[in-house]
């Protein structure tokens, strides 16, 4: 290893971001999407599944949406906003965002 590589390696900071922080970023982004009603709990109580993949962060969300929204457009907007927020704050790529619509809330 050259001196330059050692210096570069020593300058690299090591840190870890708690899953609750990432979940908070995702929830913040979801609040900006008009048609989202709630994040649904999964079988094991998880609202948001976070995976660390070789190519970046993988996310899985189970959502309840508000009645009257076009699902394809809503999913696309949700993925875009979540990806932007997570990448902006963490400076790490988001490799995938899986969204499962678990229900539609009828609001009178």
Regions found by a protein language model. Name each.
Residues 10-48:
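N-proximal, solvent-exposed amphipathic alpha-helical segments enriched in charged/polar residues
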Residues 71-90, 94:
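Short, non-transmembrane amphipathic alpha-helical segments
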Residues 93-108:
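Short, highly charged C-terminal tails/helix-capping segments
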Residues 3-4, 49-50, 105-107:
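Intrinsic low-complexity, intrinsically disordered or marginally ordered coil/linker segments
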Residues 33-64, 101-103:
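Short edge beta-strands and adjacent turn/loop segments
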Residues 63, 67-71:
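Amphipathic, heptad-repeat alpha-helical segments used for oligomerization and assembly
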Residues 1-9:
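N-terminal, Lys/Arg- and Ser/Thr-rich interaction peptides
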């Amino acid at each position: 290893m050259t001196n330059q590589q050692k210096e570069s390696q020593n300058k690299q900071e090591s840190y870890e971001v708690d899953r609750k922080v990432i979940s908070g970023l995702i929830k913040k982004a979801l609040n900006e999407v008009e048609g989202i009603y709630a994040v649904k709990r999964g079988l094991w109580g998880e609202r948001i599944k976070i995976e660390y993949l070789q190519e970046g962060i993988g996310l899985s969300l189970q959502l309840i949406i508000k009645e009257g929204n076009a699902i394809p457009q809503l999913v696309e907007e949700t993925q875009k906003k979540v990806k932007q927020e997570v990448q902006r704050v963490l400076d790490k790529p988001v490799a995938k965002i899986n969204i499962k619509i678990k229900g539609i809330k009828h609001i009178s």
